[in-house]
Amino acid sequence: MSATVERCDVCIVGAGIAGLNALFTTSQYLSPGQRVILLDRRQRVGGMWVDTYDYVRLHQPHSFFTAGNIGWTLGAQPSHLATKHEVLTHFDHCLDVLRRRVTLDEYYGWTMQSDAEADGVVHVQCQSDDGRTMVVEARRLIKAIASDVEPNDPLPLSSTSVHSVSPNYCDMRTGDIDASNAPVWVIGSGKTAMDTALALITRHPGREVNLLAGSGTYFAHRDRLFPTGGKRWWGGVTFNAFVDEVTQLFDGTNEDEVARRWRERCGVWVTPRAGNFLLGLLSTVERDAIAEGLNDIVMDHFVDAVDRDGKTELQLRTGAVREIDPDSWIVNCTGYLLKHSRPYEPYTSPSGRVLSLNARAATLHLTTYMGYFLPHLMFTDQLTEVPLYELDMIELRRKCNAAFPHTIMTLALHNLSLMTDALPTKVFRDCGLDIARWYPAPRQLLGMAQFLSTHHRRRPHLQRTLDTVAERFDVHCAPLARGSAPTQPVPAPAAGRADHG
């Protein structure tokens, strides 16, 4: 059977938060009659939120998790941390809004298999879950695969005496694990582990819940980054100030010093040691509830659970062994982000017709920001001209997890500095993702003024830091080569931000 051929102006692959932001930006440049095709391997809009565990909540106040500047219809307090159901409902609302702006055709249950450019057209080969094939011929292609998060499977165990489960397939608040009073071992120390431990502890106070925490994780202190009441005017630490401080101190060689300074100023953690930071948020109330409810915290890494001589034991990476009760529950909370290694693909094709939002060529700190800002460069024909640095986040995490968060912030600040010179002011005004908006307008304006007055002269330091990371860890962290010539910086205007509209 021959493949169906569909033609459109823009094809967007991926209907998660990155894809919806790409669609939002696309809608700013197309007329209502121009056609966009949105396809996703899942059966609905939502990306990883379709598959994630049922008791998940957003890290940050809900209004900043959106497409562009589309407002929520929830009617909740600004500090509300939205649930999975609320997030998916908001995805539906965003899509409803965007359907009114462009001609949108949606293909769910379809996977992109390949793409190729020829004669100014991008040919996208796709296949459906039931085996049908389709070729999309588009003027532009945006691959919003982003982090490509997959559900976690239960950990494979040698023991037959304990239960191995994953939050993706086992809600801690229902079913057999909820009915059992056997001990639980939560494996991991990131956000999933904190959510899981908190769900277990609040559901059945006094139940034995243990944390096998690996190297430990520290979090950004939500109470300090998002203060409430009068403290929004004079308290807390604005995210812009926090990033500015971190990136001024970090030089590509001193990640341990930066982490110590940062934890003292704006960190919170549950474990006695905390070596990892993946931009997660935690409050004092959550931290205290988890810390008080845990029976034990073990700072080691899981290897296996085995039955030996009538006992069940956890085998740990250090060689230590920990005896556990029969019928214990082992919950895999080892994390989702940056675990799957796709082949490297640059963020743009040489023609600028293909934009790829992926972790092997990251340009900003969050996929939401990449989905929003990079299509603006694409549609203004600057995607191949502005010398953004791209970073292989997966490889850096493998080689030096401690340097990862500081490098990501440096990357984001450098590239946003370049975009500030290249894009109209309206692009930044319409970005509802900016958490600086948590604070009253005077504090926002002060932060913006400080950025505009310093970002040109600070850019060389950011470049040196990124170059140092690339050389020190032998990871890809550089601007894209333009043909055979070295990339030249975009000249900076005399002052302020270019305003093209």
How would you name each of these model-derived features?
Residues 4-7, 11-12, 17-45, 141-262, ...:
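Rossmann-like dinucleotide-binding core of oxidoreductases
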Residues 52-76, 227-247:
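N-terminal glycine-rich dinucleotide-binding loop that anchors FAD/FMN and/or NAD(P) in oxidoreductases
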Residues 53-56, 158-159, 225-229, 344-351:
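Short secondary-structure boundary/capping segments
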Residues 65-96, 245-277:
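Conserved N-terminal/central alpha/beta ligand/cofactor-binding core
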